[in-house]
């Protein structure tokens, strides 16, 4: 494959020469990256995943069309995914983006910006170009998809150029480069599975099958059982399936979820299912130690390195050599320590505190946080380069309110543990199970365990009934978390704590994503109210779809953002459920 030389292109301008007017609010970009990361971690074939990424791009960028082209080992187009046509392979890939354009981006390894494709020789090499729009000027932006300095493909967008508005190339390139970084990790993961002779993720799934149906279809894969993980809800099983696939590799995993969702259990599961299972599993809570002590704990120290260092000590990285290291609350480390950690992750080498000898370590890293790292990066509180190092495979753990069907099994398992510890033989009555199933549990499994232990301790008979629960006697202090801002005499959740909650799995407001700079977080509410997410999760797929359409004013694109889907999937779901779109 002949590449064009890396030289200025007719009709294209270098990035620095273009005006740097703001393209959109930072909140929109954060929401876009979050939605794309969810698409990339969903179980599906690579072609379908990339097509869904393009659909998400079209929801967050004002574009005419977009495309992702994946190159094979010889540099030839292998997959071409767009939002308008089904994913294509080699023959159709050449018609999506001109071959000369792909060659130019692959050769230079740099973004390509063309303000008017009709004036660029790269776009005139093929007859009847599909990107041509007559006399309307079309601008083009493309970036390479790279991993370890190897070009895996390209991501590109084009839009109708508006001479009255500034050309927002800088913001577009930055956003597309972040997307390309995430896409490159997914491509490498799929290729690794193919080399290992394993069935690609989602190989037998239909491209047209919407995510609503996927989530509601337990049994599309044989269920995976992990010790310590209790539940068979679709939301939990999807995470378990992802964990079982990711565990076979050495990729860094970022576990995200609210407090009490079981991040440490899943980290342990990844280690036990990995080839490193016979090596050490070491864990450390980064928020529990000050920066100076944290450095010594992770990297170790030499004798006499500081007051009290009476002997040489190995750090957690050395102790986990050959195995797995879990860094919990990774979002709480200081910027200065982030730079030190980044070097270890990049080079695989470290020096003990007070030492000069460089030590090589082989560690599989798992990080966990309930903090919104995208917002922290935007606010310069968390290094972007470290974010990309630790967020290779992000896995979002569902809160308990999104899997209420698992509450009875969890409650019985927790009660069995209590019985063994206290030599009791307590059981739950059906009314007791009903009470717990209707609770909101802002503290997730940790709060459920608190509720079970308190109720079991105070139970007056061997069978726990509904009247034994504190909430039935107006003594449940956790219910104060359900009071919203402005409630008379109510206690509200601290604003700083809310800012540390990661984005919800799907936006529940009627507005479009990114309409505000603030990333919405789950607000505690009355579990018996109709607006509570715990009750919403029990609605049927058809009810959720109609509710989202009504909130969006029957605009499919807005409803897609509310549901966390693409407009195409919403349209398919409307046809599948025979829902007539209202004209307002």
From Swiss-Prot:
A divalent metal cation binds at residues 471, 476. Keywords: Activator, ATP-binding, DNA-binding, Metal-binding, Nitrogen fixation, Nucleotide-binding, Plasmid, Transcription, Transcription regulation, Two-component regulatory system. Residues 45-187 form the GAF domain. ATP binds at residues 257-264, 320-329. One of its GO terms (molecular function) is sequence-specific DNA binding. Residues 542-584 are annotated as: C-terminal DNA-binding domain. The keyword Oxidoreductase does not apply. CDD domains: AAA. Residues 556-575 bind DNA. Residues 229-457 form the Sigma-54 factor interaction domain. Residues 458-541 are annotated as: Inter-domain linker. GO terms for biological process: nitrogen fixation; phosphorelay signal transduction system. It comes from the Bacteria. Residues 1-24, 495-518 are annotated as: Disordered. Interacts with sigma-54. Required for activation of most nif operons, which are directly involved in nitrogen fixation. This is Nif-specific regulatory protein. The lineage of its organism: Bacteria, Pseudomonadati, Pseudomonadota, Alphaproteobacteria, Hyphomicrobiales.
């Amino acid at each position: 494959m002949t590449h064009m030389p890396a030289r200025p292109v007719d009709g294209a301008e270098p990035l620095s020469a273009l005006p740097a007017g703001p393209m959109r609010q930072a909140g929109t970009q954060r929401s876009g990256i979050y939605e794309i990361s969810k698409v990339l971690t969903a179980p599906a074939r690579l072609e379908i995943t990339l097509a869904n990424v393009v659909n998400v791009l079209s929801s967050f960028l004002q574009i005419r069309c977009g495309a992702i082209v994946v190159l094979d080992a010889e540099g030839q187009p292998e997959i071409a995914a767009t939002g308008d046509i089904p994913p294509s392979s080699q023959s159709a890939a050449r018609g999506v983006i001109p071959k000369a354009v792909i060659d130019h981006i692959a050769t230079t390894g740099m973004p390509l910006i063309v303000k008017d494709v009709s004036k660029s020789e790269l776009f005139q090499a093929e007859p009847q170009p599909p990107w041509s729009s007559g006399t309307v000027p079309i601008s083009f932006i493309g970036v390479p998809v790279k991993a370890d300095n190897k070009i895996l493909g390209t991501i590109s967008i084009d839009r109708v150029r508006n001479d009255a508005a500034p050309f927002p190339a800088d913001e577009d390139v930055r956003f597309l480069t972040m997307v390309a970084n995430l896409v490159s990790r997914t491509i490498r993961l799929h290729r690794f599975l193919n080399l290992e002779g394993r069935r690609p993720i989602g190989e037998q799934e239909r491209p047209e099958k919407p995510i609503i149906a996927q989530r509601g279809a337990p049994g599309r894969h044989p269920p995976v059982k992990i010790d310590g993980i209790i539940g068979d809800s679709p939301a939990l099983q999807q995470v378990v399936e992802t964990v079982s696939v990711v565990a076979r590799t050495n990729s860094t995993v970022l576990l995200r979820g609210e407090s009490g969702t079981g991040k440490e259990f899943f980290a342990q599961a990844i280690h036990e299912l990995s080839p490193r299972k016979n090596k050490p599993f070491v864990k450390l809570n980064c928020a529990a130690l000050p920066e100076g002590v944290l450095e010594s704990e992770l990297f170790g120290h030499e004798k006499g390195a500081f007051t009290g260092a009476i002997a040489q000590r190995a750090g957690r990285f050395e102790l986990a050599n050959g195995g797995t290291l879990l860094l919990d609350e990774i979002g709480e480390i200081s910027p200065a320590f982030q730079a030190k950690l980044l070097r270890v992750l990049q080079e695989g080498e470290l020096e003990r505190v007070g030492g000069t000898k460089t030590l090589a370590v082989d560690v599989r890293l798992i990080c966990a946080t309930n903090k919104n790292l995208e917002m922290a990066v935007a606010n310069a509180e968390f290094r972007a380069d470290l974010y990309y190092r630790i967020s290779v495979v992000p896995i979002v753990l569902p809160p308990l309110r999104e899997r209420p069907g698992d509450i009875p099994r969890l409650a019985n398992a927790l009660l069995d543990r209590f019985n063994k510890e206290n030599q009791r033989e307590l059981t739950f009555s059906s009314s007791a199970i009903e009470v717990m199933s209707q609770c909101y549990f802002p503290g997730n499994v940790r709060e459920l365990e608190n509720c079970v232990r308190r109720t079991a301790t105070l139970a007056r008979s061997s069978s726990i009934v509904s009247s034994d629960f504190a909430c039935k006697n107006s003594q449940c202090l956790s219910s104060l978390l359900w009071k919203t801002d402005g409630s008379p005499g109510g206690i509200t959740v601290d604003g700083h704590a809310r800012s540390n909650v990661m984005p919800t799995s799907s936006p529940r407001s009627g507005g479009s994503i990114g309409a505000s700079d603030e990333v919405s977080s789950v607000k505690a509410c009355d579990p018996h109210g109709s607006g509570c997410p715990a009750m919403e999760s029990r609605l049927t797929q058809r009810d959720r779809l109609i509710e989202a359409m009504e909130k969006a004013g029957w605009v499919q694109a807005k409803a897609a953002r509310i549901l966390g889907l693409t407009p195409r999937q919403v349209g398919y779901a409307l046809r599948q459920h025979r829902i007539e779109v209202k004209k307002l």
